[in-house]
Every structure is written in structure tokens, then in C-alpha cells.
Amino acid sequence: QLALQAELYSVFNSMTDGDNHKFSKGISDAFKNFVDSGKPQTTDSGSIPTGTFTGASTDGSMTSDSSGCESIIQTACEAMVDGSKSNDYIAEKIAEGLQDLTDGTEVNTSVSGTTVPPVPPPPTIPTSGSAKGGIDCDTSPVEAGLKACFSAMVDMTEGGNMYFASELARLTYTCLTSGTVNTDGVGNLEGSKGVGNAS
């Protein structure tokens, strides 16, 4: 969370008025870096070709694509240029961009456990394998939190960039760690399903 806050703060401090591209790219890149640093943990079980498997993830990775997020925020920034859109609008679009990014995030895990084989047992009984899936996140609290953040910033004469960075980092951290990871076993663990979260 602190690394995300620092990256966002650096983006906001380096901006000049009207620098929409730096804003959209900076936020989307920061989101991507944070999500990609996440560690998924799952509990896995299910009927696989060689029996009934029960286990858990031992390692994992998350990989996201920030291009859709960047495009959503960039388009929103351009729409705000004429002053017809409020701060609530950009709050909605930042949350929408984060939703797009998390929806497209790929989760891969290494899984180990035990398999109860049928009778007679097959020649090979797997105790490990891999799984692939994604993460389901709810970004509505991010939208609500940013609307409150922007409202509070209206009367600020200093410290706005740090406040914005800290709030967006906090909201993003809570969003990701509250999400649900779902995976499906592949190969020798096909049929097993994993459920968990990310840290």
C-alpha cells in the first residue's frame, strides 16, 4: 500500500495543468504494478481424473493489463476539459478503470495436496499441479471513497496531492485484498477448483 501511495504521489507531483495523459497513464501504471505484486492464496478441492483432490496454493502470481484502464481515465479527463463534468465523474471513471483492470487480471497458482484415488488406484496419483483463474473485485467503495476524497479536497490549500495519493492507495488496497480469487485446476488437476484471496 505504501509503495502504491508513493508511486501515485510521484505522478501527481510531476503533473502540470492539463497533463491528462500523464495522469491517466500514471494511475493505470500504478494500479497495474500494485495488482501484479499481489500474492494469491487459494484452498483447492474437487474431483480430478485420478480421484478426489484436496490442497492449497503454495505460490502464485497475478498479471494485469493497464491499457483499458488508461483509456477509460484518459477519455474521462478529456471529457472534463470544458468543465461540464464534476469531480464525481472522474471518481466514477477511475473506479471503472480499476474494475476493467481487475476483471482482466490473470491468476496463476502452484498447488499441492493429497489425492484420494478410486479402487483400484491409477498408476500415478498427483500431489501437486497448477491452476489458473482470476479475481473478482468490487470497486464501488473506491468510487464512493474518491467522491468523498475530492469533496474534502475542495477547501484544501496544501497537501492535496498527498491526501489524494494516500486515499486512492488505501481504497485500492482494500478493494484488491477484499476480492475473491477463483481458479480452475489444469492438467492433472483438471476438475479441481480453488477459492481464496490476494494479499
Q: PLM features: what roles do these ranges have?
A:
Residues 1-199:
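Extracellular "spike/adhesin" assembly and maturation modules
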